[in-house]
Amino acid sequence: RVLFRSYIELNKELIKNNINTVYNYINNKNASANELLKQKLKFEINTAHDIMASIYDKYKNQKTKEEIIEIMKTALENVRFNEGRGYFSIHTMEGVNVFHPIYKEFEGTLVLNRKDIYGDYPVRDAIAIAKAKTEGFFSWYYYKLKDKSKELKKLGIVKEFEPYNFIITTAEFEEDFENKVKNETIEYIKDIGDAEKDFIFIIDKDANFLLTRTKLVNVSDIEKENIFVKSYKELKNSNDKDKYFQYEHISKSEKISYLRKVE
C-alpha cells in the first residue's frame, strides 16, 4: 500500500511538471504576442517604404509627381499580409488620404477629424508621431470590414515618406493576432505527451474546449456532473490555482488528472 501511494505521488508530480511546462509555454507566448506583432508590423511598413522609395528613385527624373504616386498605389494595391487582413494606406501630413485599397471613398478626402468610440484621432496621432520621430506605434478602435457591430482595438505603425511629405500606415486588430498566437500554441501543445496516456486538454474562460480528444465543445455538453465537471467547477470558482483529482478510467484503471488555471 505504501508502494502504491509512492507510485501515485510520483505520477502526480510528473503530471504537474508536464502541465507546468505547458503553462510556462502559454504564458511566454502570451507575453511575447504584442512584441511579435510590433516586429511584424515594422517589417511590413519597411517593405512598403522600400517599394515606394524604389519607385521614386527610378522615376523621379522621368515622370511627374502625380504619375509616380499612381505607380506607387498600383504597386501596393494588392499587397496583403497577416492572412489577408493587412494592407497599407497613405496620407499627406495635412490629413488627406492619398491611398486606401479597401475604402476607396476615403481617397482625396480630409480624414484628419475621424475619431474612434473613445474620442481618439488615429490620423492625427499618426501624423504627430511621424513629425516627432519619423515612425512609431499607435492604437485606436475600429470595426472589422465584415462586422460593424462593434469597434475593436487595432495596433498600428506609421512611417514617414519624406520625398512627398507622406505618411504610410498599417495595422492589425489585436484580437486577430492574439487568436493567431492562440491557435499556434494549441497546435504545438497537441504534440506534447502520449495521446493515449497523458492527453492534455485546454478550456477557455467560457468553458469551451480549445483542445480535447473528444467531440465535446463545451463543459456543459457533459450530460452528468462527473468528477471532472465537479473538479473543474470547484477550481474555476475558487482562488486556488490548481487541483488534482482521481477517477476510474473506462479500462478500470485508476487515473490522475491535474487542472491548472492560466491567468
Regions found by a protein language model. Name each.
Residues G86, V123, K148-K159, D242-Y244, ...:
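A short beta-strand signature within small-molecule sensing/ligand-binding domains used
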Residues Y87-I90, V96-P101, F106-E107, N113:
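Mid-length scaffold segments of soluble, non-membrane domains
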Residues A31-S32, M93, L216:
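Surface-exposed, polar/charged faces of alpha-helical domains
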